[in-house]
UniProtKB/Swiss-Prot annotation:
TPR repeats lie at residues 129-162, 432-465, 473-506. Residues 943-953 have a biased composition (Polar residues). The gene is ZIP4. This is TPR repeat-containing protein ZIP4. It comes from Oryza sativa subsp. japonica (Rice). It comes from the Eukaryota. Residues 248-269, 925-953 are annotated as: Disordered.
Amino acid sequence: MKISELSPEYREPPSHAGLIADLSKAVSDVESFAASATAPEKLAADLRRILTSLASAASSSSFTESLSVQIWRLGTRLWNAVVDRANSAALAGGPAALAVEAEIRQAAPELLLLAGIPNGVPSAAAKVASFFHRSGLAWLDLGRVDLASACFEKATPLVSAAATEDRGVLLELNLARARAASDAGDQALAVALLSRSKPLAAASPEGAKSLAQGYLSIGEATLAAKHSNPAVEASTLFTEALDLCEKAASPSSSSPRTPPYGGATPKTPNLEGLKRRCLRFLALERLQAQDYEGVLRCIRVSRASMGLEEEHPSIGVMAMRAWIGSGNMAEADKELERLMANALATENLCVSAAEAYLAAAGPEAARKVLIALAARCRAGGAAAAVRVVKQVIDGGGGGIGRARAIAELVSDERVVALFDGPGNTHERGTMHALLWNCGTEHFRAKNYDTSADLIERSMLYVSRDEESRSRRADCFRVLSICHIALQHLDRALEFVNEAYKVEPNIKCAFLKVKINLQKGEEDEAFKQMKTMVGCVDFNPEFLTLTAHEAMSCKSFGVAVASLSYLLGLYSAERPMPMPEVAVLRNLIELLSREPGTEAEILKYSRRAKQRMADLGVESFFGSGIVGGRELNWFADLSWNMGLRASKEKKYNFGAEFFELAAEFFSSRNAECDENRSKVCKALIMAVTIMLNAEELNNSPLSDSDIKKGVEMLSRAGKLLPLISPSVPVASDQLEANNFLYLHTFNSYQLMGRMGTPAHPQQLQLIKNFASSKACTPANLLTLGVTASKGALPNMLAAEFSLKACITTALASQSPNYRVISCALRKLACLAGLQDLNGSKSDAAYDVFQQAYQIVVGLKEGEYPVEEGQWLVATAWNMSCLPLRLHQAKVARKWMKMGLDLARHLEGMKERIASMQTTFENFERVSGDEPDECSQEEAPKASISGSMSQPVLV
């Protein structure tokens, strides 16, 4: 009997009538989905409200039979409408729309469950359970495991005690619950539900097949999730699935005690496909467990059961990986060939298998594999080649052997042919990039030969169109650089010329300069440097690079020329690669390495001074410590160049260098005593070198030079107190004394060159110096000698200097008798020229008498021999003129002086006898009358010790 044939009960309570009316209207709206404008969300909400009301009514009083039948009729209509809606493409939508439809679907079994099981409806409980089962599957497909499980759990009690013919529904429910548990991550519950279903599945081969599929599905999920529960193993699940397949395929699998519903004989399902699928997944599980023998056993069983149809491609892949894992590369090679011959294998799968094989076999097998792929992959051959080459490159051990294998691989004509055509533009670019990157890695490792080989092969994948012009030029330039590094200079020049043809730019011009420099062709390098400067994309940075390259090649001229040209660009208000001061420093440093470059160094040092004045110290040299170092470098360089030029007697250069040093030292930290001390020294040295240049060139200083020298000395004089060291150190004090002397000496010299007489000022200058602690006898001797020379000698200054020299020297703890003797000689000469007391002979005699007093009592060798001989000879010879003039008294005085000096000086002993004889003869000739002045004019005792009185004959 059908539900529609049941007699309705018309005496319904009024409250139920309203609910039935609302339900009927809602069902009608669901049925008329094509013409109704009611939104699915509203339908779902209405059904939820009606279900809530019915549940409330059922809890207060049980439904009558007629009411239950009405609800069943409406619930069945609702289910049929839901099925129609699901089959309609008009309601297809996203996950949210499908969730609403699933909620409407679930309302049907919920209504039937509320209505209860009416009498006369066959298998009513099984139908409700089936509706819940299908509703749960809908939720499961949407990923709502909680709602799906709720549906399954409501359905299970309805059929758990069902008759034999309804146990199929219970099996389906258990399988669905197992799937839901697996999706929720509860693999243990899923396995328990599958185990609980074994008695149900034993009733028919189809049931066994369904359970086997359930085990396989849960096994796949477990394998994919790598479930950590040791009680649940994917291999066990796959084995269970295989056992069920075997039982289902057996003719005796159906129990005679449980005949099928309707009495029909069950058909044995085709389980070979399912078995092979189970074997594939079991092999995969064994492969993950690295049980390579287990993998191969599964594959053998699968292949043994295979008919004429093609095997699944994954079988070949797993077999190859298993052979690789067991170390049998020959069998792995065979499996790879078999896979490529399999028409079902996709190109992507073949390439992936080839990558795995090459990762184990190494680059030596790449050529064979790539040729096979070229024949196998018709549409994606270029992409396959790219993947294989990438695998070889990324395979590790990036040595030269691997690079050579790559080069041979990509240069094969069959491989290159795969990239022909406009459709492979992307693959060509990728292959070029792979080879380029590999080549640059070897370049960074300084394997230039290998790098050049790879870069050259990469050009096979660069088209000759306009878009690839820049890339081709880059390749040519890198090839040129590699050959430069290998010293294949002619070959490098060929490549850079090709690059220049493709894309003329400054990079090519610079490489030509580099090659010419390394070949030692400076003239060609000069020409190419001019070409480089004229390039449209000229960048001053390349002049800096040229200078560095020229210095490394010891090409002094090119380095200087490049820096000189670079220096000329700093006034153009353009960004420059390095500060102007750094260019000047490097240029001067280069010039200072070569002899005879003082003029050039001076020119650029002047430029530095001028730019410092124009821009300011910090703007030109920089601020902080760096700027201070730059400034000190120029100051020290000027000082050192001044010393070098002076040593080489290039006084014109030396004077200006010292003048520049003073300017640099005074330009920063003027309040610093150390800097002001250096300024003072530099100014004094500048004037000193000017005077030396005048003497060397024998050309008087100009009035402007004299004026400048006076100004510099005046400026230095104000700074002289700063020269003395704060802490007394012998060497520093000596240097300070020397500069004080030089200042005095130079000032004396310039005073003598002024237009007006300056004898008093000169004398006062020497007196001031003589009273200072810096004064030494040697300084006074030099001043005295200088004062006695020249066109306008200052005799007063000379006499004062020489006398002060003698006095100072005698007062020292260790008198320097060489200085004293020189001063005595000069003083004697002055006395011979001018008698300060009005008597020429008396002034000279006083000097000799002073000399006699000094030498008496000296140790042998203390007084210089040659000076002593000069004193004796000069004193003796002074008697010659008086003798001729018959001035016996004067002659006797000088002869006795010479004889007395000879007795006390070394080296005169041989002559004393002859001198004594001569003197005695003179006495006889001059007469016997006593000499009135003999006692008065005889030499007095030495101030340094006692002496015997000369014997008067």
